[in-house]
């Protein structure tokens, strides 16, 4: 059985990708990050996901991205912005962008993949996020994969490492629809940038608004609780 390394945040995208990798019959090794994020609730949500999909091993890696901040998710001096509906969302990179986050996460995933002998890494990025988050575009994934195969022992030995981004051309609406078809229980996910201490989502941050809109377009109620 082929092994995969899945980046798992506890949000809707990574949960859907986990289901896709499971459907493809990979032996799954999941990797999550405790990087000083406000939305630490996501790390509690992944527990149910790893049980459902029989994850072989789950690594939670501690990284202190608060050391340099620069994002509303890692710096208490920067407020998480709230919006009034889907049409009010910004078309520029917002303050919730975490500098180089996907590059950092993928680098750890590559290291883990080399150790366990996996040539397949899965990440839940998609182009519909790329206007706000530049490390979610196809060109980024392609360039990172090329770099990895130039700069790793596996790569130079001809054991090509592939960065799988199965959601890359999907909208959030399509991602939720795909996950529902695969039986993803979105009750065990959280997207909010600033949830309460008892894991209630705010409903007004960029992530919550996009999530709620996607469920609405699928004519289904979001199963998580909001303030």
Curated annotation (Swiss-Prot):
Protein name: 7-cyano-7-deazaguanine synthase
Matches recorded under HAMAP family: QueC
Enzyme class: ligase
Native source organism of the sequence: Rickettsia prowazekii (strain Madrid E)
Family membership: Belongs to the QueC family.
EC number: 6.3.4.20
Disulfide bonds: none
Keyword ATP-binding: yes
A Pfam cross-reference name: QueC
Pathway(s): Purine metabolism; 7-cyano-7-deazaguanine biosynthesis
Statement: the UniProt record of this protein carries the keyword Protease: no
Free-text comment on the cofactor: Binds 1 zinc ion per subunit.
Gene3D superfamilies, alphabetized: HUPs (3.40.50.620)
Cofactor: Zn(2+)
Catalytic activity annotation: 7-carboxy-7-deazaguanine + NH4(+) + ATP = 7-cyano-7-deazaguanine + ADP + phosphate + H2O + H(+)
Binding site for Zn(2+): 192, 202, 205, 208
Entry binding sites for ATP: 8-18
